[in-house]
A protein has these predicted regions:
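Short, solvent-exposed coil/turn segments at beta-strand boundaries
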Residues: 77, 124, 159-166
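A solvent-exposed, acidic/Ser-Thr-rich amphipathic alpha-helical stretch
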Residues: 52-59, 74-127
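A short hydrophobic beta-strand element
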Residues: 125-137
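A mature extracytoplasmic/lumenal domain signature
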Residues: 91, 121, 133-135, 173
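Exposed beta-sheet edge and beta->alpha loop/turn motif
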Residues: 135-163
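Low-complexity, intrinsically disordered terminal/linker segments enriched in charged
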Residues: 167-187
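Bacterial Sec-dependent N-terminal signal peptides
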Residues: 1-51
């Protein structure tokens, strides 16, 4: 260790002899400023990259549910869902095939479907959407025969998106209100 300090001192002495101590201080300051600028640019670039991915996740997620619900194309979930997707519902739904079957109930159970995202936000790999679902119950919905009643419910979903795939969803809505609108539960 002592040798290292001695060598370091000798190198500094040689550089001072060549350039003068004022030049070293000036050069060190310039190097420090350049290093700080480089660090700042790197942090800014990484932050911009993360913000760009967050914006992509938000756009992707909105597009998926517009296509699935409004256009009735449940096949979109083949590319949008991760193979091991988890839907935190009652009961818990796991796997892409089961998740597709779950959402197919909404497409086959309701005509005149409208899925409107009222507000959405994202941070990192999480997307949150506040939504409104409207439709007429004209088909079988999770075993419930058509009631020909209109529904208009609001809810919120928290989703996780990893590598461009939806890996997890948690939906929250007033199920009592939904069942009352279907005429299944009394008001």
């Amino acid at each position: 260790m002592g040798t290292y300090s001695n060598d370091q001192s000798r190198i500094l002495k040689i550089v001072e002899d060549i350039f003068g101590s004022n030049q070293i201080n000036s050069t060190m300051k310039k190097m420090f400023i350049c290093l700080m600028a480089l660090c700042t640019l790197t942090v800014t670039a990484v932050s911009a990259q993360k913000m760009d991915q967050t914006a992509k996740n938000l756009k992707f997620y909105g597009h998926v549910w517009d296509v699935v619900v409004n256009e009735g194309r449940v096949d979109m979930l083949d590319t949008a869902f991760a193979e091991n997707v988890v839907l935190h519902t009652t009961p818990l739904v796991t796997g892409k095939a089961n998740a597709k079957a779950y959402f197919a109930n909404y497409v086959t159970g309701f005509s005149n479907r409208q899925f409107i995202v009222r507000e959405s936000l994202a941070q990192g790999n999480k997307v949150v959407k506040y939504w409104n679902f409207k439709g007429k119950h004209t088909g079988t919905f999770f075993g419930i025969p058509a009631t020909n009643k209109d529904v208009d419910v609001i809810g919120c979903t928290i989703a996780t998106i990893v590598n461009g795939k939806i890996t997890e969803e948690r939906d929250f809505m007033d199920m009592l209100e939904f069942l009352q609108q279907l005429g299944i539960m009394p008001r």
